[in-house]
Each structure stands twice: as C-alpha cells, then as structure tokens.
C-alpha cells in the first residue's frame, strides 16, 4: 500500500470509522470526511499509535460546492492524489413506506446515498484516470437487491442506483486502470439503525455484522493487485434473525 492516499466519507462513525482505523493500522495515509469535527477527532484518537496516518477534514459532501471545496483542500495539503476513494457516508429516512414518505425525506436520502456519490466520483476520478490508477469502493446495501421496508423505499432505490453506478464506472474506465466495487451488506450494527421505527436492542445488534467486519472487506478489496477487481460483494450475518416486528413497525410509521 505504498504511495496510497485514501479518502473515506462518513469517517466519524460506523463503517467509515472502522475502515479508517484499519487503513491506518496498515500505514496508509487516510483522509476522513464528515460534518462533525468531534466525531472525526474521536476516530483519529481511536487509531492510537497509528493516528498520525489519519487526517480529518470537516466537509459537507451533500452538494457540489462542498465537494469542490473538499477537493481543493486535499489538493493543497497533500502531494499525492486520492487513489482510493471509499464512499461510505449514508443516511436513511424515518418513514420507510413509499406510500407515506414525505418528498423532503426522499430527496435527502437519495441525495446523500446516490447524488453525492456521483459528484464525488466524478470529481476525484479525473486524477485517477490521468494516472491510470484508482480504486473506488462504495458501501451499498442488501436493500439494493432485496427492496422493502427494512431499508426503506428511498434507501433501497438509492443503493440500487449507486450499485449500478459502480458498474457503469467499471464498464467505461476499467481499461484506464480504474476499479469500482460495490459492497452490499445486510444489517450492520451502526448508528444508522437508530433511525428505524423499531430500534434494534443490544441482543439483536450482537447478531449483526460489526463495522470492523466491513472494514476488513474494504481493505482486502483495495489491497488486491491492480490487475484484479472485485466488482460486487454481497455479505450477510451468519445468524438470520426474525425481522417481522421491525417490518411491522416500519409499515405502521406513517408520520
């Protein structure tokens, strides 16, 4: 992983935090991005002796202006270009049903889970293409394959879109040395679960995949020889829990 510079969105918690720590453990210069400086600082502190490899940048990547500002700041501070991009930032709606979700919740979920990924890929791919080397890894979701109330209508639609976007990048730019991977996990014990109508309890969360499990997959994918690309990864918890109460709660939450 020499001469690598990794950018991770949503690095202040969950999968993004675990991934940043994993890359730092492997001595990879890593930039974590998020809206909360305190959360980013906590990620850096949790890396302990490897914290020197983690760089924190407070940024709003929900719009093109924020992404352009982030790009300019990285370009100014670092000699290397971002050659590993991990699109991890995401959000879900409180109302999951397509029949009841307000447009503002729909727009917010689609914007952060799909539109911002398109914008940040477009911006940072230019240097990857120029240098004939780049890896883009996007945390999609099992909701892309199995839409329903557990993830919610806008979340599933956005994740299906972003999975297709990674395929489009591979189709167009693989011969330019660009690799794009879509990782589609089932339930992972992260703060996004707190947006559900029925918030999973500790026992339920203990059966789920943990952020560090996904971090292992992200690192493995990025660390493969450049001649090899894992285009899609579908990963689930070994234990299949009963989610009927979760689905019922989501169905009944209409405001």
Task: Label each residue range with its predicted role.
Residues 58-70, 103:
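The beta1-alpha1 cofactor-binding region of Rossmann-like NAD(H)/NADP(H)-dependent oxidoreductases
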């Amino acid at each position: 992983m020499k001469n690598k510079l990794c950018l991770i969105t949503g690095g202040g918690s969950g999968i993004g935090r675990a991934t940043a720590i994993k890359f730092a453990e492997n001595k990879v210069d890593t930039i974590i991005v998020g809206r909360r400086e305190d959360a980013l600082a906590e990620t850096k502190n949790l890396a302990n002796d490897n914290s020197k490899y983690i760089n924190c940048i407070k940024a709003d990547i929900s719009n093109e202006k924020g992404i352009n500002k982030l790009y300019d700041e990285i370009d100014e501070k670092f000699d290397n270009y971002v050659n590993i991009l991990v699109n991890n930032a995401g959000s879900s709606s409180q109302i999951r049903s397509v029949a009841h979700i307000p447009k503002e919740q729909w727009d917010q979920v689609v914007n952060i889970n799909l539109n911002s990924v398109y914008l940040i890929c477009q911006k940072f791919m230019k240097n990857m293409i120029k240098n004939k080397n780049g890896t883009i890894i996007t945390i999609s979701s099992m909701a892309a394959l199995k839409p329903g109330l557990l993830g919610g209508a806008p979340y599933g639609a956005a994740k299906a879109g972003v999975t297709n976007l990674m395929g489009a990048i591979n189709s167009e730019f693989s011969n330019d040395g660009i690799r794009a991977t879509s990782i589609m996990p089932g339930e992972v014990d992260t703060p996004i679960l707190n947006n559900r109508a029925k918030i999973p309890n500790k026992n339920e969360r203990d059966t789920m995949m943990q952020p560090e499990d996904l971090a292992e997959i992200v690192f493995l994918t990025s660390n493969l020889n450049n001649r090899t690309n894992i285009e899609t990864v579908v990963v689930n918890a070994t234990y299949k829990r009963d989610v009927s109460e979760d689905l019922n709660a989501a169905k009944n939450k209409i405001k």
